[in-house]
């Protein structure tokens, strides 16, 4: 029998990040997937990133993950969403050439050190009890009956657990168009008493590029130059193409309304679909007052005639889909290459997980991605990398785990939401979910997380060197700006009015004002024109222009956010101290006086690792938190006294 430190099941976005992370940490890792040819498949939209989501991609990259580098090799239309607003809500997004993205992922995964890929499916586990009576993973059992020994398993099954596809009245067991579902594995999870629920999602029909009348559509041009996701990418090399915009109309809506009874939405209403990415049937039915809905026509590749009409996901019968498409401006003669469909699938209640994404029921078993009730490639990747890291650390018998918090990352926000609050609908990240979004931005993911990754040997020396060079250059530039001073009176000659208190202001001080930018500073201090060639004494391995832009941008953003970040840091410090108060894993809450039976039951079920986590559980009162804190402190005092 073969033996591996870590086995990852599923070759999607979560699985690839989990497998790569475990392998980077030195774990002998096996990635098991139904088809090697579908590793890195973009099952739905051909794009990576977006508001909040783009920050996650940067965070994964900062930890030496692979998604950012792969999309940079496949990017054919790049934009920074919300670029006219503050940096806290910037959303990097890139349209991908599907083939190039999958090719990039496969090239990385199939040549990764410490990583083996096997084409197979997993149906069951070999589980044993340890000396403490805990259930532990000992092996995975494949559909062919093979036992593969391992103590750590990461499940990243996507929409495959008892997946069923719906196109009108046509129902097909499938995890994705053309791929069989994972039925036995779902039964296995049920056997071990995991709480399973049912969710659904959907995808639009794919259109033939050559049958679309592009001349009457609104063109949407990407950013020039396109901005890479990865901190290691010098520039985007692929040719950039435009996307186009059209809209549904009253006739489109009439066709949909007349056929709502034939849509899967009509008989799957008890299975919840994504709230923030609704099907066109839901849009028309829920927002009846709207006369049109926007559709983005997104190319799926440079040499691919397939077009993705973002905004009309549906599960109507194919003949209705054809009629609907032809009612839309520019699509009157459009041909459908593949129909849209809905897919329903099993997910587990993520409250059954620790923040490491290890399950509470079975030691050594981790879940990541849509199996946890999330939606989106980026959310999957963020979970995958955390699960892979912790599986590898645990396999190496290192005591520490790797947990990101709400205060340091969007990944931390997402996982905290999942394991504490759970989900009743497909979970999607937004900036509004992050209380500390001013500090966890798309521009500073490397400065927030790369050191953390390097400290556990997850991050390469190359990436760490790039970060150190960047930090040194930022420091030098801030020192340069801090050495240049001017009085409020002198500023009047440049049309700048600030408080006339007689106190000299540095160039760095001025940069914090909303109406002062680099151009204004260069007007006051012409010698700062050299900042356009700023490269720092240590230099950079990336293209000078991007390095310069990142450094100047970092200094300006930090200057403008500084007053707010100082206040926020005080809040974050208090929160960190509170959330880091540890609660023993097998803590007996019934010993704490004053806790109701309801509170005890919730705490025993969720098993919060810290006071901060316990506070977020619905129904846990401040009085209960105080009682637990007092009990823990008294116990700590008694233990200390016994050793005195």
From Swiss-Prot:
Sites where the protein binds NAD(+): 273-287
Localization, UniProt: Cytoplasm
A cellular-component GO term for this protein: cytosol
An individual GO BP term: tRNA methylation
Cofactor(s) of this protein: FAD
Taxonomy, superkingdom: Bacteria
A Pfam match: GIDA
Record carries keyword tRNA processing: yes
List of residues binding FAD: 10-15
Coiled-coil portions: none
InterPro entries referenced in this protein's UniProt entry, alphabetically: FAD/NAD-bd_sf, GIDA_C_N, MnmG, MnmG-rel, MnmG-rel_CS, MnmG_C, MnmG_C_subdom, MnmG_C_subdom_sf
UniProt GO MF annotations: flavin adenine dinucleotide binding
Protein keywords: Cytoplasm, FAD, Flavoprotein, NAD, tRNA processing
Quaternary organization: Homodimer. Heterotetramer of two MnmE and two MnmG subunits.
Role played: NAD-binding protein involved in the addition of a carboxymethylaminomethyl (cmnm) group at the wobble position (U34) of certain tRNAs, forming tRNA-cmnm(5)s(2)U34.
Family: Belongs to the MnmG family.
Name of this chain's protein: tRNA uridine 5-carboxymethylaminomethyl modification enzyme MnmG
Gene designation per UniProt: mnmG
């Amino acid at each position: 029998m073969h033996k591996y430190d870590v086995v990852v099941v599923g070759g999607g976005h979560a699985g690839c990040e989990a497998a790569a992370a475990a392998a980077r940490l030195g774990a002998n890792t096996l990635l098991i997937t139904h088809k090697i040819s579908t590793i890195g498949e973009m099952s739905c939209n051909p794009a990576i990133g977006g508001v909040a989501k783009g920050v996650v991609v940067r965070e994964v990259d900062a930890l030496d993950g692979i998604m950012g580098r792969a999309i940079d090799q496949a990017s054919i239309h790049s934009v920074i969403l919300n670029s006219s607003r503050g940096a806290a809500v910037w959303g990097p997004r890139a349209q991908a050439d599907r083939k190039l993205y999958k090719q990039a992922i496969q090239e990385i995964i199939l040549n990764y050190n410490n990583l083996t890929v096997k084409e197979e499916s997993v149906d069951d586990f070999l589980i044993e009890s340890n000396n403490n009576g805990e259930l532990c993973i000992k092996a995975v059992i494949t559909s062919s009956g093979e036992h593969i020994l391992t103590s750590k398993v990461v499940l990243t099954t996507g929409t495959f657990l008892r997946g069923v596809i719906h196109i009108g009245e046509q129902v097909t067991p499938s995890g994705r168009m053309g791929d069989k579902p994972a039925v036995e594995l779902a039964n296995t999870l049920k056997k071990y008493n995991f709480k399973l629920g049912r969710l659904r999602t959907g995808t639009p029909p794919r259109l033939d590029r050559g049958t679309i009348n592009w001349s009457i559509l609104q063109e949407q041009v990407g950013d020039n130059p396109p901005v890479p996701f990865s901190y290691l990418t010098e520039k985007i090399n692929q040719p950039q193409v435009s996307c186009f915009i059209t809209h549904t109309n009253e006739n489109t809506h009439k066709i949909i309304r007349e056929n709502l009874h034939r849509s899967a939405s009509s008989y799957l209403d008890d299975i919840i679909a994504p709230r923030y990415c609704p099907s066109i049937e839901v849009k028309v039915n829920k927002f009846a007052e709207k006369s049109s809905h926007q559709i983005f026509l997104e190319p799926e590749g440079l040499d691919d005639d397939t077009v993705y009409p973002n905004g009309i996901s549906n599960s109507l019968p194919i003949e209705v889909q054809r009629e609907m498409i032809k009612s839309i401006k520019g699509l009157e003669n459009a041909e459908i290459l593949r129909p849209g469909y809905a897919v329903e699938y099993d997910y587990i209640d993520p409250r059954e997980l620790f923040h490491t994404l290890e399950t509470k029921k079975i030691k050594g078993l981790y879940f990541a991605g849509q199996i946890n009730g999330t939606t989106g490639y980026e959310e999957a990747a963020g979970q995958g990398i955390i699960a892979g890291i912790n599986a590898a650390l645990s396999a190496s018998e290192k005591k520490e785990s790797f947990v990101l918090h709400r205060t340091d990352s969007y990944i931390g926000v997402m996982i905290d939401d999942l394991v504490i609050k759970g989900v009743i609908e497909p979970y999607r990240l937004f900036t509004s979910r992050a209380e500390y979004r001013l500090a966890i931005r798309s521009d500073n993911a490397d400065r927030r997380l790369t050191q953390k990754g390097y400290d556990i040997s997850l991050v390469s020396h190359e990436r760490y060197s790039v970060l150190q060079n960047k930090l040194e250059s930022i420091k030098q530039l801030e020192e340069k700006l801090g050495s240049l001073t001017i009085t409020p009176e002198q500023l009047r000659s440049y049309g700048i009015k600030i408080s006339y208190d007689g106190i000299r202001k540095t160039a760095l001080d001025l940069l914090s004002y909303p109406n002062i930018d680099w151009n204004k500073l260069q007007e006051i201090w012409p010698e700062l024109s050299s900042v356009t060639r700023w490269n720092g004494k240590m230099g950079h391995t990336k293209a000078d222009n991007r390095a310069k832009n990142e450094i100047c941008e970092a200094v300006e953003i930090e200057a403008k956010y500084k007053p707010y970040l100082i206040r926020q840091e005080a809040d974050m410090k208090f929160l960190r101290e509170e959330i880091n108060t540890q609660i023993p894993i097998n803590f007996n809450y019934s010993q704490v006086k004053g806790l109701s039976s309801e509170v005890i039951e919730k705490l025993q079920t969720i098993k919060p690792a810290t006071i901060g986590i316990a506070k977020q559980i619905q129904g846990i009162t401040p009085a209960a938190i105080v009682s637990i804190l007092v009990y823990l402190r008294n116990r700590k005092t008694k233990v200390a006294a016994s050793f005195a």
